[in-house]
Amino acid sequence: MKIISVGDLHGRDVAEDARGLIGQCDKMIFMGDYVDSFEHTDQQILDCLRTVIDLKKEYPEKVVLLWGNHDIQYLLGHKRHGCSGYRPQMDLMLYTEFTCHRDLFQLAFQHKDWIWTHAGIHDGWWLFSFKYNMGFTNIAAELNFAFDKKEEALFDVGHRRGGYKDVGGPLWCDRLELLNKPLEGYNQVVGHNKREFIERARWKELEIVFVDALHNDDKFVYHISNFKDE
C-alpha cells in the first residue's frame, strides 16, 4: 500500500501535479483546508475546491478528502466555526459546494496503526473531551460517525489557537499540543501546522508527520507512506 499525503491547499492549483501522481499510489489523501487564502483569488479558490471534488468523483476509492477547519466554517457556519481568511462574498457559494458534495469528504482516515486527520488527535482530548465510545474498533470510523452527528468536541479550539479549551480537537489541534501527548498507540499524519518542509517528529515510539508545506509554491510537496500489506 502506497499512500500519498498532500497538505493544506488554500486555493493552490494542484490539478496537474495530482493527476500526474494518481496512478503511482493506492491512496491520495488531501489533508483539508481547500479554501481561504491571503494570496489567491476567489476564482482560484473555487477552482481548487472543484478540482479535488472532481478527482474524488473520478477516483472514488483512491482519493480521500479530509475536512479542515477552514472548510468547516463554510459548511457549518462562520459565526460558530470562524477562522482567519474568511471570505464573506464566497460564503453562499462555498456552503453550496460543500453541502452538495458533503458525502465526498470525511474527518479521518486510518490504515493499520496510522491515522490521518487535518490537525491531529491529542490523547487527553480523546480520553477526556471526546468520550464518544460507540464500540468502534477503528478510530477513524468513530470520528467520522461522530462528525456526521456533529459531536461538539470535534470542533474544540485550544488556548494556543485562541480558543477556550485546554487542547484542540482533530480540526484545530496545535502542533505543540499534539507533540505534548499524541493519541497513544497510533502514528499520525496531519496538516494544519505550517512547516517549511515536511516534518517527521517522534514521541516515544510514535511518529507524527506534519505535511502542511505546500506554501512553498515553487514545487508540489507531498509525503509518501509505504506499507507492506499482507
Protein language model features and the residues they cover:
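Active-site-proximal loop/helix segment associated with metal-binding centers of metalloenzymes
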Residues: 106-181
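Active-site environment of divalent metal-dependent phosphoester hydrolases
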Residues: 10-15, 36-39, 70-76, 122-124, ...
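A general structural motif
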Residues: 1, 23-26, 60-62, 112, ...
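Short, conserved loop/helix-junction motifs that constitute active-site signature segments
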Residues: 22, 57-59, 181, 201-204
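Active-site neighborhood of phospho(di)ester-bond hydrolases with catalytic His/Asp-centered motifs
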Residues: 5-7, 28-32, 64-68, 116-117, ...
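PAPS-dependent sulfotransferase catalytic domain
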Residues: 88-117
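Binuclear metal-dependent phosphoesterase catalytic core
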Residues: 199-230
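Core catalytic region of metal-dependent phosphoesterases/phosphodiesterases
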Residues: 6, 11-97
